[in-house]
Amino acid sequence: MLYIEKEGLPNDINSKIIELSKSEKWKSISEDDTTAIRNAFDNDFPKNEAKEILLHEQHGICAYCMRRIRMDNHSRVEHLVPLSKNKDMAIDYNNMLGVCDGGEKVTGNQGHILCCDAHKKETEIMISPLNKVQMNKIAYDSEGKIYTKPKDEDMERDINEVLLLNGIQKKDGTVRDTSTELLKGRKDAYDRARKMMVALNIKGKCTSATVSYTHLRAHETLMN
């Protein structure tokens, strides 16, 4: 996960959202009518325009797992505070993130270990890619596992139990990766970066600039 800095919406899109919020149709929807709120968000909210801006400000990566996402049916608009929990925040752009499909469309024999929004569903979480202090705690080990440093139990609970960013740990201690192979992708990126660092060190070219470049290449590999 990486810190996401909101850029805001253009005036024309903001105007559409304000118009929706002031409409009689929106005002008539009760706070607990999740179906009606969802229908209004899907049909009356400028969702595609908002999604395009989300992907731009997130540099085309999922807000949770950092996989590459594009303007297609493998990406979606996620509500950080679930749509079912707060009517007003259902159309608040500052409550929205661009995320992947979490492996819902993956085919094959791996099985469906969903992640990100696909597994989170309507669960409320305290971890947020919009929180810079939290994102500065995110770290990765050599096996591709995400953890927090210093340790934050609430964040790790959301990472491991709600978003499933580290797959599922089985009773025998082994880990089953997600359908999107998040752990494998991170481990492969780590291994490539380590090999590049070793090679550069042997050549005497292991400078701070090359370290930064190597980290960037590893991150690009992870996103694809």
Where are these regions (language model features)?
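Histidine-centered nuclease catalytic patch
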Residues: R67-K121
